[in-house]
Amino acid sequence: LLANRLLLNLFSAVIYVLVFRLAYVQYLYPVWGYMGYKYFVHSRWVSLLTIILAVFPILFYKARKIPSDFISIFVYIFIVAPSIISMEYGSANYNSVVLIQIFYSLSMIAFFSIKYHDKVIHRTKENAIPVNVYYVAVIIVLLTVIATYHSNMRFASVEEVYDLREETAEINTNPIVGYFMLWLANFFSPLFVATGLVKKNIKIVLLGFFCAIVVYMSTALKSAFFTPLFCLLVFSVVKKRNHEIISLFPSIVLFFSLLYFIGAAVDNNLAFVALSLFIMRTFGISALLTPGYITVFNSMPHTYYSHVRIINSITGMYPFSEPVLGKAVWSAYTGEA
């Protein structure tokens, strides 16, 4: 069974990497090249090495019925494999990125190889921090954020997202509030959703989603909803039978491959653009961002975490005039700055 699972995952990884390379060349670069996707042709040996580095980590994937294995395969599918491939296509000088490719591959191997307890450990010791402390803390954080952004808070439509972001960027000059926003989105929201699911308490789950809603209404960050929804997804998956967990990776690869080949077979401009948009917004985001960040930080000063406002308020080391790091990097990468 273990050997069959290994072969299935290896075969799926090879298919995924090869199909993603085709999708990059035929969809991502032609349609979204103006956004920053680049395409440099290298030798067949470079392509072979890239494929090996992208596929090899899957040999260490366990596919056990635990959340960490579920998360790790998503990291591989949406971040590591596309990033390794895009480093080849997005770099004119392959020698400048090959070590980074190796680092990505080894990091994914380490992630897959971490040993976890297969059985749940029941601890009799009470939590060191009383649960009421978390409730008091989240109330303080929520009130601070709402008091800061209340005049601009709203559910922004797709057309209004960037308008709201510009408005709120002008409001918050206090690094503490920005720090609270990070805690709200990345700690309190998933904490309460996960706790509510485990305890089967819908009120706690709703509190977690309320934290995400406040973040979105304040900053228009669509990713605010990703974490609580991902918690729901992980919770539902780990409750499934073992064979459903094992088939997760091959199923995603099959879906992606069918999507690509059906799109390639349909001679329709609208379908071509729609498919390109879907691939770019799901599987292709890391393939866009990774070469950009590598290129910029190979030639420009590092931030040393000074892009975090509370750290920059102490060190003053932030090297860009644009306060939002992503915008600063992308302006430098695309030549707008």
Each predicted region: which residue ranges?
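Loop-centered beta-sheet repeat module
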Residues: T219-T282
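Cytoplasmic juxtamembrane regions at transmembrane-helix boundaries
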Residues: S83-Y89, K199-A220, S313-V324
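Short, well-structured alpha-helical interface segments that form or flank functional binding sites
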Residues: F188, A224, G335-E336
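Small-residue-enriched transmembrane helix-hairpin modules in multi-pass membrane proteins
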Residues: Y24-Y39, V161-P175, Y179, F256-A337
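Membrane-anchoring hydrophobic segments
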Residues: L1-V193, L197-I202, L206, K239-I245, ...
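Helix-loop-helix junctions and helix-breaking kinks within/between transmembrane helices
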Residues: S86-L99, F210-F235
